[in-house]
UniProtKB/Swiss-Prot annotation:
It is an enzyme of class 3 (hydrolase). This is D-aminoacyl-tRNA deacylase. GO terms for cellular component: cytoplasm. Keywords: Cytoplasm, Hydrolase, RNA-binding, tRNA-binding. GO terms for biological process: D-amino acid catabolic process. A Gly-cisPro motif from one monomer fits into the active site of the other monomer to allow specific chiral rejection of L-amino acids. It comes from Clostridioides difficile (strain 630) (Peptoclostridium difficile). CDD domains: Dtyr_deacylase. NCBIfam families: D-aminoacyl-tRNA deacylase. It catalyses: glycyl-tRNA(Ala) + H2O = tRNA(Ala) + glycine + H(+); a D-aminoacyl-tRNA + H2O = a tRNA + a D-alpha-amino acid + H(+). One of its GO terms (molecular function) is Gly-tRNA(Ala) deacylase activity. An aminoacyl-tRNA editing enzyme that deacylates mischarged D-aminoacyl-tRNAs. Also deacylates mischarged glycyl-tRNA(Ala), protecting cells against glycine mischarging by AlaRS. Acts via tRNA-based rather than protein-based catalysis; rejects L-amino acids rather than detecting D-amino acids in the active site. By recycling D-aminoacyl-tRNA to D-amino acids and free tRNA molecules, this enzyme counteracts the toxicity associated with the formation of D-aminoacyl-tRNA entities in vivo and helps enforce protein L-homochirality.
Amino acid sequence: MRAVVQRVSSSKVTVDENTIGQINKGLLVLLGVTHDDKSSDVDYMIDKILNLRIFEDENDKMNLSLMDIGGELLVVSQFTLYGDCRKGRRPGFSNAARPELANNLYEEFVKKAKDKGVTVGTGQFAAHMMVELTNDGPVTILLDSSKSF
């Protein structure tokens, strides 16, 4: 499982000109799933993302987590995080999970974040979405549950 985590002052996702998910201060998470991901990958990513200390404390040091500041989460499915561009000029997506598995794990991720008391907005799985964000920093972190990077 891969995630691009961006610290934002606000973010929203629209489908067909309708806003379907919106947050204020918090994290925008673009979430990708691969073939062998399972619930343990979701647990790893939830723990890591909710507890990443990437918000400033009173001394302007990145020392506070989303949980510490009571921030919000906007989660958007993103199969293109598994795009392979090593050959040719068009990415291949064979490393992305099949939609059934990806959607199940995406929904599990959202549920587990909500179960932790986080306000969560979402995109729409497999839809063409417009994502707007106001980066704060900017701070952008790449995560991979297999710890590839």
